[in-house]
Regions:
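Membrane topogenic/interface segments and analogous intrinsically disordered interaction regions
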Residues: 1-269
């Protein structure tokens, strides 16, 4: 009897009289989902530690022909193992986190919004992976080869780098290109919301290109080839974003009309 009373009290805390979830219920659901994501992250890090040596091998495969890797500080090698394992844990957690974000927001979304939300998360994940793969397969090998052998002279200088510097460069490039490849998706979202339009993107393209090259100069080694290799894809993606903005741009009036039509359809159902 006492157990049934406790269950009813807990249910009353979570669900309101009209069947909707209370603030306490939402907070409990959010807490549970955060705990699940945290557990997945911890498990991912622990499992990745067992394969940290293989992960380091994958990273260093791009530069082994051009560099000799050394560990300068006593803790340097161990710290890179931890860094790579933590990054692998994040990679494993991101799809799970995306799912729980969608599941948490789904009750408050319309059918069309729910479908668009799922599409955005899926495309975002795919584009980020494509950006990282582009950096790993194309950009990084060329950059490492150029930085090592592109300048003639001083042949007595050995091309040696610390494992920390190398891992820093790799992870920085992966994150940059992963984020840069999200540009078309961000443009689609903002254009669909009516915040930006193709005319605006065309007007500011000169400023945008200057900013792109400035960012490339900050995040890459100080040589023009590396800067152009980073800035080139960013400029190309910017012009692709202009094209996509022209397809998906909708003024606010159109969005309001669509919302009204969706509401009418739901009332009829």
């Amino acid at each position: 009897m006492a157990t049934n009373v406790k269950r009813k009290k807990k249910k009353a805390e979570v669900m309101a009289e009209d069947g909707s979830m209370t603030l306490t219920g939402h907070l409990k659901e959010l807490r549970n989902r955060l705990i699940i994501c945290a557990v997945v992250f911890v498990v991912g890090v622990v499992v990745s530690l067992a394969y940290a040596d293989r992960l380091i091998d994958v990273l260093t495969a791009m530069g082994r022909d051009y560099y000799e890797f050394v560990s300068i500080a006593p803790q340097e090698k161990l710290m890179q193992y931890f860094r790579v394992s933590i990054l692998a844990g994040v990679v494993v957690t991101v799809p799970v986190a995306f799912y729980h974000i969608y599941a948490f927001a789904k009750p408050g979304l319309k059918r069309s919004e729910s479908a668009f939300f799922k599409l955005v998360m899926l495309l975002g994940l795919i584009l980020f992976c494509v950006g990282v793969l582009f950096a790993y397969k194309l950009m990084m090998p060329f950059m490492l080869r150029f930085l090592s052998t592109g300048i003639n002279g001083a042949e007595y200088i050995q091309t040696t780098t610390s494992i920390e510097s190398y891992v820093n460069l790799c992870l920085t490039m992966f994150i940059i290109f992963g984020c840069v490849f999200e540009m078309p998706l961000i443009t689609i979202i903002l254009s669909k919301m009516g915040i930006i339009n193709p005319q605006l993107l065309k007007q500011v393209r000169g400023v945008a290109i200057v900013i792109i090259f400035f960012i490339a100069a900050v995040v890459t080694p100080p040589d023009i080839v590396s800067q152009c290799m980073v800035a080139g894809p960013m400029v190309l993606l910017y012009f692709i974003s202009i094209f996509l903005s022209g397809i998906f741009y909708k003024p606010h009036e159109d969005d309001d009309d669509e919302d009204d039509e969706d509401d009418e359809d739901e009332e009829e159902e």
